[in-house]
Amino acid sequence: KGFLVKDMLGLGIDAYGIDVSEYALMHCEPEVVGRLHIGNALSLPFPDKSFQAVTSINTIHNLSRELCSTAIAEMERIAPGKGFIQVDSYNTPKEKELFEQWVLTAVYHDYPWEWEKVFKTARYTGDWYWTNGN
């Protein structure tokens, strides 16, 4: 519904967003009308190098590992070296078990070192961090 875009606009940032949900776009915050696009991270509807920054917070876990790599490469395409991606992760088998009980919709999640392989495969040069049990 554009909450993050609205917050960024409030800071004076020229922000845009995408959502897979037409409902979210139809019921978005009034301040972000025209700044949200229907789409997904696999094929971002923006030209190469069109942004000074890109962010994805706990969203790409809805994709398979292979498609996570595709989505990450798309983010790199529109803002090379200027991204921040937060992914879901865990450090121990116990944390993994708790994660799997809590996040029911995640398709791909893994240990940090496995996520690092995904970022490397995507040739991602931005920043990343993971949400975990620590």
Where are these regions (language model features)?
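Hydrophobic adenine-recognition pocket in adenosine-nucleotide-binding enzymes
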Residues: T59
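Class I (Rossmann-like) S-adenosyl-L-methionine-dependent methyltransferase catalytic domain
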Residues: K1-P45, L63-T70, E74-R77, G81-N134
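A conserved beta-strand element that flanks and buttresses the S-adenosyl-L-methionine
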Residues: T55
